[in-house]
């Protein structure tokens, strides 16, 4: 279990309140699919994923990215119970989708890159540390069903 200080919780929540979930979600998932192309196999029903511009402009990628980032909103609200918050998604991704749990870590790291690019100087090392801790906790929670 990951323990967050009150300061870390406030830092994460403060930045999260400024995130455009729709815009950032599409960018996070799109970048994951471009940078780690083997992840595309989980999205074969998304249509054209043949190039980075096709991926980044794909409406299904954008829609699912929004859904993924909305789940991160649940993490922000329930930082003290990530395992419980993501139990259903862990089961889905393990039992039905057979997603390699390492992909959750990759997604989290891409999310941190996107947040840094969106928030620039506001994304200080302290903010990054809090977010890295959160995305690591979410990745562990999503991988829980695998253990």
From Swiss-Prot:
Q: Where, in this chain's numbering, is heme b bound? A: 64, 93
Q: In which tissues is it expressed?
A: Red blood cells.
Modified positions (Phosphoserine) are: 14, 51
List, alphabetically, the GO terms of the cellular component aspect: blood microparticle; haptoglobin-hemoglobin complex; hemoglobin complex
- Keyword annotations from UniProtKB, A to Z: Heme, Iron, Metal-binding, Oxygen transport, Phosphoprotein, Transport
The Globin domain covers: 3-147
Name any Gene Ontology BP term: hydrogen peroxide catabolic process
Q: Which superkingdom does the taxonomy of this entry point to? A: Eukaryota
- Which portions of this protein are annotated as coiled-coil regions? none
Q: Which Gene Ontology MF annotations are present? A: haptoglobin binding; heme binding; hemoglobin alpha binding; metal ion binding; organic acid binding; oxygen binding; oxygen carrier activity; peroxidase activity
Main function:
The epsilon chain is a beta-type chain of early mammalian embryonic hemoglobin.
**Known partners and oligomeric status:** Heterotetramer of two alpha chains and two epsilon chains in early embryonic hemoglobin Gower-2; two zeta chains and two epsilon chains in early embryonic hemoglobin Gower-1.
Please give the family membership noted in the entry.
Answer: Belongs to the globin family.
Q: What's this protein's name?
A: Hemoglobin subunit epsilon
Which organism encodes this protein? Bradypus tridactylus
**What are the top taxonomic ranks of the organism?**
Eukaryota, Metazoa, Chordata, Craniata, Vertebrata
